[in-house]
C-alpha cells in the first residue's frame, strides 16, 4: 500500500510539471524552451521528485499552479542567468544588438546633424569632453558626464547625441537616427540604450530625495542594510507611486478590497489637482526605498517610460513582481523571468501572489536570485564598463573624424568638497 501511494504521488508531481490543463493560468510569456520540458523532468532522479513532492504537493492546485512550477524549473535550468559571467558578459549582447544596424551602415555627419534637435550633443576630442551649452535637465547631464569623464582618457575622438528626456525618440519603420536613450519600448523604438543618469544623479525628486534620486552605490548600501530577514517581512504585496496612467488603478482598487493581500496607494505628483486624481482618496505620503523592505512582495509598474524604481526594489531582498511591459532599460533583458523576478498581469496577479504566499521557500529563492544579480551586476563599476564598451564600439561605426565645435562648453570634473 505504501509503495502504491509513493508511485501515485510521484506520478501526480510529474503530471503537475508536464500537463497544462485548459484551466491553467493564461500567461502568455512562457519560457523559450517551454516545449522541451520532458528533458527537464528526465534529469530529476527519484530523490529530487520526492523532495519536490514534500515541498509543493500539499499546495498543488492543478487548474492554477502547474504552469508556475514548470516555469520556475525551466528558469532554473536556463543557461543565461549570468551567475558566472562578468557584468560585461551579461550585457554585451545588448550593446551588440543596439549597434548592429549602425555597424553595418555606418554613422555619418548627416546622421548626427539630423539627431541634434532630439538630444544633447556631446563631443570627445583629444580626450576632452565638450557639450552644447544648453541642457534641458542639468542634473541628468551631470549624471551622464560623471561616467564620460571617468572614461575620457580611454576614448577616441567621437560625437554622439544623448536624449535626456524620459521618453525615447526613434520609431521603428521610420528613418533611423543614432540617438541614445535610457529606455525604450522595445516593440516600437530603435533608440540605442545607455545606463540612466540616475545611477549618479538626476533621478526623480521626491520628499526623501529632494535633489533627485542618485548615487546608486550609496543607496545600495543603505537599502541592503535596512532590509529585515525574510521571515520578518510582512506577507503583503506593497506599492506606492503616483498615478502616471490608469494602468495602475486595478492594484489600488484591489488593495481597498483585499488589504490582506495588497497595500497599494497613490502618492501625489505634479499633475495632482484633487482626490479624483487618486481615485477618491487623499494621496499617501511618499516613502523611502528602505521602507519597502518591510514587505515580502513588491510590484513594479512602468511609468511614463521604464521605471526608475525597478532596480532599487531588488535590493530589499523581497520578491519582485514586474507588470508585463515591452519597456526596457539596458539591463532588463539579462533578468530571467521566474528566476530573478516574476512577471504578472492584472488577470493572473492574485493567483500568482497566492501561489507564492503558500510556497514561501520558492518566493525566498527567487527574491535572493534577483538581489544577487542587481548587487553583482549593477555596480557603478559595471555601469562605467557598459559605457566604455558602448562608446568604443559606437566609435567604430563613425565614418568621419569629428571636428570640435568651438562654441561648445568644455566639461571638467567637479571639484570634491
Put a short name on every predicted segment.
Residues 2-28:
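N-terminal signal-anchor transmembrane helix specifying type II single-pass membrane topology
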Residues 3-4, 9, 240, 254, ...:
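Generic structural signal for bulky hydrophobic/aromatic residues embedded
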Residues 1-3, 416-417:
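A positional/structural detector of protein chain ends, strongest at the extreme C-terminus
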Residues 286-415:
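Catalytic binding pocket for nucleotide-activated donors in carbohydrate/polymer assembly enzymes
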Residues 3, 166-168, 234, 241-243, ...:
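Short, flexible loop/turn elements at secondary-structure junctions
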Residues 23-288:
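Secretory-pathway glycan-assembly enzymes, especially type II membrane glycosyltransferases
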Residues 11, 18-20, 157, 232, ...:
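Generic structural microfeature
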